[in-house]
Amino acid sequence: MASGSGPGAAASANLNAVRETMDVLLEISRILNTGLDMETLSICVRLCEQGINPEALSSVIKELRKGTEALKAAENTS
């Protein structure tokens, strides 16, 4: 087989495409000031790929952030 062909090359090209896609999504996320890091964004993408409704996922993330902020505020006033 010539170099750059075969299953290994295809897997490598696919991995590079996935990385590039995630980099673009992370940049969009930063532009939109979502506060999501690469790991969290990756989890969200996988959940959406599994059929989770993106709007519902967004609502859950917002509610979790509100809860976290409320807990932090309560700790600061104690």
From Swiss-Prot:
Keywords assigned by UniProt, alphabetized: Acetylation, Cytoplasm, Cytoskeleton
Top-level taxon in the UniProt lineage: Eukaryota
InterPro entries linked: MZT1
Keyword Acetylation: yes
Biological process, per Gene Ontology: gamma-tubulin complex localization
Pfam families in alphabetical order: MOZART1
Localization terms from the record: Cytoplasm, Cytoskeleton, Microtubule organizing center, Centrosome; Cytoplasm, Cytoskeleton, Spindle
N-acetylalanine modification, residue list: A2
One GO CC annotation: spindle
Family: Belongs to the MOZART1 family.
Its job: Required for the recruitment and the assembly of the gamma-tubulin ring complex (gTuRC) at the centrosome. The gTuRC regulates the minus-end nucleation of alpha-beta tubulin heterodimers that grow into microtubule protafilaments, a critical step in centrosome duplication and spindle formation.
Subunit-structure text: Associates with the gamma-tubulin ring complex (gTuRC) consisting of TUBGCP2, TUBGCP3, TUBGCP4, TUBGCP5 and TUBGCP6 and gamma-tubulin TUBG1 or TUBG2; within the complex, interacts with TUBGCP3 and TUBGCP6 to form a luminal bridge with actin that stabilizes the initial structure during complex assembly. Interacts with TUBG1.
Name recorded for this polypeptide: Mitotic-spindle organizing protein 1
